[in-house]
């Protein structure tokens, strides 16, 4: 970075500082780093897309005017989302030692690395297993199966494994794909008669990372193709990493031959973060995004938001935005006001049959209409009985009302469902785990 650019920018932000409140300046302007100044174009590095959006909509004209006051020129401002590390490399004209092709770089999120992952009691085992696999692909645990609820860090760990392997061996062929994308590509390959290309893409590689594998349940052709892909990679001593929202034995309508293969290696779960981990996550986020958040505010967030990492980080950003837009200092009172809709809805929302039907349908990869339909196939009838059981346990609705909500069924059908699930729970461990998971998801709604 040239001395001229540095001096010009420092003078500009001194002018801008006089036009803003301290909280607005520290939150939005202080985090900017100048990258380059060419002709009438100034490139400025910002830490994230959220900051970029705020700067473009609220502060861009202020920056342009400050520079015009200094130089008598009107500059075009271009905000670039990047990190300090990337800025430094650009300044020094250094080449990255990680060599990946364009397709690879778009598959792995640069933010999801082991360094940015916050370790706590809830995820320590999954993190250790992921690092072991990254250090010794196909030698430590193969496959590695990571499961846990939404927003707990499964995808983060999978991307971190990919980055780590590419850093140590840039020539490795690493492919990250969601099960939905895998299915769509398979369908297109059949339609376009490109089966060979599809198989080459997923079988002639070193590392396969498949996210949300539970969505292939019930898709016979996809399961068939993935079975052969799994076998080809495993027999060639290539690493397979899989994520899901539940363990293999609880994925409904998954073929037994796939289920058993998923259990060949190591199964690691991620739980909701405890208070200490939630605090660490918030501090890490504030540090990365260069946000000045009082400790008591982070304690407030960590106490009120308990379900997952995404909601924690979302609450933090919401508070910062609320502070900037209202020109108020960040405090517990402001945090309470900013999050009142989120917190009150979590604290007061009652469990309803609609919520139960939504959660059960999602868990078993069904539509809510299936639970209300007249269809009696086991893959629908059993989840329907579970939903009726939970409706009886978790709501104050009468038996006739519950029956009515499930396609106008008689109250005796509800009684039968309740008794059947109650009896099965006494002897079926997998059902016990399913009910436990469903209860947790219902409570998080």
Curated annotation (Swiss-Prot):
Where is the protein situated, by its record's location annotation?
Answer: Cytoplasm
- Region entry Domain II, spans: 73-106
- Region annotation (Domain I, interacts with DnaA modulators) maps to 1-73
**A cellular-component GO term for this protein:** plasma membrane
Task: Specify which residues bind ATP according to the UniProt entry for this protein.
Answer: 151, 153-155
Annotated CDD domains: AAA, Bac_DnaA_C
Q: Name one GO biological process term.
A: regulation of DNA replication
Keywords, comma-separated and alphabetical: ATP-binding, Cytoplasm, DNA replication, DNA-binding, Lipid-binding, Nucleotide-binding
Principal location listed in the UniProt entry: cytoplasm
Residue ranges of the region described as Domain III, AAA+ region: 107-323
Annotated region described as Domain IV, binds dsDNA, given as residue ranges:
324-445
Q: Cite the PROSITE patterns for this sequence.
A: DNAA
InterPro entries the UniProt entry points to: AAA+_ATPase, Chromosome_initiator_DnaA, Chromosome_initiator_DnaA-like, Chromosome_initiator_DnaA_CS, DnaA_C, DnaA_dom, DnaA_N_dom, DnaA_N_sf
**Chain's role:** Plays an essential role in the initiation and regulation of chromosomal replication. ATP-DnaA binds to the origin of replication (oriC) to initiate formation of the DNA replication initiation complex once per cell cycle. Binds the DnaA box (a 9 base pair repeat at the origin) and separates the double-stranded (ds)DNA. Forms a right-handed helical filament on oriC DNA; dsDNA binds to the exterior of the filament while single-stranded (ss)DNA is stabiized in the filament's interior.
Its quaternary structure?
Oligomerizes as a right-handed, spiral filament on DNA at oriC.
Entry's free-text remark on domains: Domain I is involved in oligomerization and binding regulators, domain II is flexibile and of varying length in different bacteria, domain III forms the AAA+ region, while domain IV binds dsDNA.
> What is this protein called in UniProt?
Chromosomal replication initiator protein DnaA
This protein's species is: Clostridium botulinum (strain Langeland / NCTC 10281 / Type F)
Name of the gene this protein is made from:
dnaA
């Amino acid at each position: 970075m040239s001395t001229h650019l540095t001096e010009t920018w420092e003078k500009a932000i001194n002018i801008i500082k006089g036009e803003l409140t301290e909280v607005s300046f520290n939150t939005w302007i202080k985090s900017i780093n100048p990258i380059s100044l060419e002709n009438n174009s100034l490139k400025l590095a910002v830490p994230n897309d959220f900051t970029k959006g705020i700067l473009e909509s609220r502060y861009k004209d202020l920056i342009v005017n400050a520079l015009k006051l200094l130089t008598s020129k009107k500059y075009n401002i271009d905000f670039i989302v990047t990190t300090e590390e990337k800025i430094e490399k650009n300044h020094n004209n250094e080449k990255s030692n990680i060599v990946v092709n364009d397709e690879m770089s778009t598959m792995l999120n640069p933010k999801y690395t082991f360094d940015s992952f916050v370790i706590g009691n809830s995820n320590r085992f999954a993190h250790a297993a992921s690092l072991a696999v990254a250090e010794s692909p196909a030698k430590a645990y193969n496959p590695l199966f990571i499961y846990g609820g939404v927003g707990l860090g499964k995808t983060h760990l999978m991307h971190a494994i990919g980055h780590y392997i590419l850093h140590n061996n840039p020539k490795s062929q690493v492919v990250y794909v969601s099960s939905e994308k895998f299915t769509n590509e398979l369908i297109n390959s059949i339609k376009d008669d490109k089966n060979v290309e599809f198989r080459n893409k997923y079988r002639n590689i070193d590392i396969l990372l498949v996210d949300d594998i539970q969505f292939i349940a019930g898709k016979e052709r996809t399961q068939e193709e993935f079975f052969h892909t799994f076998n080809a990679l495993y027999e060639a001593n290539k690493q397979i990493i899989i994520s899901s929202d539940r363990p293999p034995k609880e994925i409904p309508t998954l073929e037994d031959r796939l289920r058993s293969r998923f259990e060949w290696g190591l199964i690691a779960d991620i739980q909701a973060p405890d208070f200490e981990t939630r605090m660490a996550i918030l501090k890490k986020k504030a540090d990365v995004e260069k946000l000045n958040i009082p400790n008591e505010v982070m304690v407030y967030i960590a106490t009120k938001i308990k379900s997952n990492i995404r909601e924690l980080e979302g609450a933090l950003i919401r508070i910062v935005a609320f502070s900037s837009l209202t020109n108020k200092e960040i405090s517990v009172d402001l945090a309470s006001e900013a999050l009142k809709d989120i917190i009150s809805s979590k604290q007061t929302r009652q469990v309803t049959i609609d919520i139960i039907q939504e959660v059960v349908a999602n868990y078993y990869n069904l539509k809510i209409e299936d639970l209300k339909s007249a269809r009696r196939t086991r893959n629908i009838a059993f989840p329907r009985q579970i939903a009726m059981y939970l409706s009886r346990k978790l709501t104050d609705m009468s038996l006739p009302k519950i029956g009515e909500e499930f396609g106008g069924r008689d109250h005796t059908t509800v009684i039968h469902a309740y008794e059947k699930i109650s009896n099965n729970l006494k002897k079926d461990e997998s059902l016990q785990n399913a009910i436990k998971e469903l209860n947790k998801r219902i409570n998080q709604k």
